[in-house]
Amino acid sequence: MAWAGSRRVPAGTRAAAERCCRLSLSPGAQPAPPPGPLPPPRPMRFLTSCSLLLPRAAQILAAEAGLPSSRSFMGFAAPFTNKRKAYSERRIMGYSMQEMYEVVSNVQEYREFVPWCKKSLVVSSRKGHLKAQLEVGFPPVMERYTSAVSMVKPHMVKAVCTDGKLFNHLETIWRFSPGIPAYPRTCTVDFSISFEFRSLLHSQLATMFFDEVVKQNVAAFERRAATKFGPETAIPRELMFHEVHQT
């Protein structure tokens, strides 16, 4: 009598299963030999042409940069892709549009206050446009490139890297718009940057580049405005805002 809910097994299948059981239980049957030990793992090789860093090399570079060792910095947790990255920041500042525009458009002085900027030299200029040679260093790499800058006074400053060896793409845009109506010496600053490293090796430095250069940029220009124009306008805390987006 079949159990309730049981399923009928075809006769051919049942017969085959019974023969298998008789063979496995017969006195002369030999048990299958146990599996042998696994061979020792072969050392992994990394081709230098692939530009992949060993964990030890990542620790050395992180130590040189003064950063804590992290798998997400140059370890295997980071994706091996040369992905374009972007960062944007919007905030109210206690300086006028004209004052902030003057600070940002004065590329010649970047070496005096922009994080990790070692050199800044304007090589040509005409109304609304200029070209500048910049050198930016953040351990363990140094980048020299020409920046093509376009300006709309006092609303916008846009800079594009034209011949860099480190970056495949580097573009920064500053936009200035009116601030709080009741506080005329204020403005809204929108800063955005997008970049992509040329090589996979350098793309692993993206986290450090964000932390050491990009995220400090707006604050550095605000401090420069304080040096040139004095204390900022005092704005009530409830009227302040600061937005950051990163991809």
From Swiss-Prot:
Keyword set includes Transit peptide: yes
Q: What protein family does this chain belong to?
A: Belongs to the COQ10 family.
Q: Tell me what this protein is called.
A: Coenzyme Q-binding protein COQ10 homolog A, mitochondrial
Q: Where, subcellularly, is it found?
A: Mitochondrion inner membrane
Pfam families reported for this sequence? Polyketide_cyc
Please state the protein's primary subcellular location: mitochondrion
GO terms classed as biological process: cellular respiration
